[in-house]
From Swiss-Prot:
Zn finger (PHD-type) start-end: 128-184
UniProt subunit comment: Homodimer. Heterotetramer composed of 1 DNMT3A homodimer and 2 DNMT3L subunits (DNMT3L-DNMT3A-DNMT3A-DNMT3L). Interacts with histone H3 (via N-terminus); interaction is strongly inhibited by methylation at lysine 4 (H3K4me). Interacts with EZH2; the interaction is direct. Interacts with SPOCD1.
Protein name (database record): DNA (cytosine-5)-methyltransferase 3-like
Gene3D superfamilies: Vaccinia Virus protein VP39
ZnF region ranges: GATA-type: 87-117
Cellular component aspect of the GO annotation: catalytic complex; condensed nuclear chromosome; cytoplasm; ESC/E(Z) complex; heterochromatin; nucleus
Taxonomy of the source species: Eukaryota, Metazoa, Chordata, Craniata, Vertebrata
Low complexity composition bias: residue spans: 20-30
Source organism (scientific name): Rattus norvegicus (Rat)
Amino acid sequence: MGSRETPSSCSKTHETLNLETPESSSTDPDSPLEEQWPKSAPDLKEEDSMDMVLEDSKEPLTPSSPPTGREVIRYEVNVNQRNIEDICLCCGSLQVYAQHPLFEGGICAPCKDKFLETLFLYDEDGHQSYCTICCSGHTLFICESPDCTRCYCFECVDILVGPGTSERINAMACWVCFLCLPFSRSGLLQRRKKWRHQLKAFHDREGASPVEIYKTVSAWKRQPVRVLSLFGNIDKELKSLGFLESSSGSEGGTLKYVEDVTNVVRREVEKWGPFDLVYGSTQPLGYSCDRCPGWYMFQFHRILQYARPRQDSQQPFFWIFVDNLLLTEDDQETTVRFLQTEAVTLQDVRGRVLQNAMRVWSNIPGLKSKHADLTPKEEQSLQTQVRTRSKLAAQKVDSLVKYCLLPLREYFKYFSQNSLPL
């Protein structure tokens, strides 16, 4: 079984360990198709079978000795018969602010803020950085369903599913998580009906960002992404994430790259499309250009209007504009006004040394959680560095751009065999 610290690959042939309990032996008849285990889920063939853990957490508890910490969750539910919706799943607090969007149970105000902050954060391996349930945890179990990016901490599975569950999972060859299982209940952990709808509603209602997120897409409904890339070609970044296949004639995503959009009109963009993602950027630092930096933003905004789907469309549509630290303060204020969202500053720090940074305007979820302002001294240092950089650097995969695109794995098909580390 793979974890964040000890990744492993799935065995092609092994005996599936079935730990079903009577209460979890059937799927939820009221769940919509997208939340049920599909009749033929992609990549989960018989020869790639995966282990399941469906424990019963109702082991004996001593009423005279109430536990401390998160252990109080099982005590309150099993001994005091408290409704789990009145307990924070993340920390065990009884000061519930709202309902947890993914699983039955409450969530307190501090944990709600942490949940929203970490929801779309990813590590270099392409999986989410924090536990799907409590948004913490140092060592995490990685769901090994090919199309899932979620992780779970040892504490959550032992407390909410049952003591010793983490050891059972760790001993398995492959493990699929509680949002991928065909059964909705594992111990105290009850997956919510229509949890993707619940997650979107929770984010839109409680999140600080004025930009609404799209409902995440079930793995078997995801389609290859169609990208319009302006001024800068992100072909390498998309391929390294698995969104584009390297071989020609494949069923992977598509990329339309346009360097000069001066004479591009709406009819041409509509003919090229439709698109799921529009990318644009100012020129990289150190490159000479006849255009002023503000020109790139205005042209990006113009083409973006041509590429947008109809207002009544439910299609997830994303856009991202990257400023390579060229826009003036006035330009940045104008960009905020036109794109109707604040900028996020992302830094590439390696070994405590600032390697690169950029400002990003986008509706891709999760980017604000990595916002880190640059000091004037840091920005000046980057400006100085680019004078000595080789233009060959532009041929490398941009790790900051890759980081921005990682959340799109929740919406579009990607090909795991093509994925490379950041």
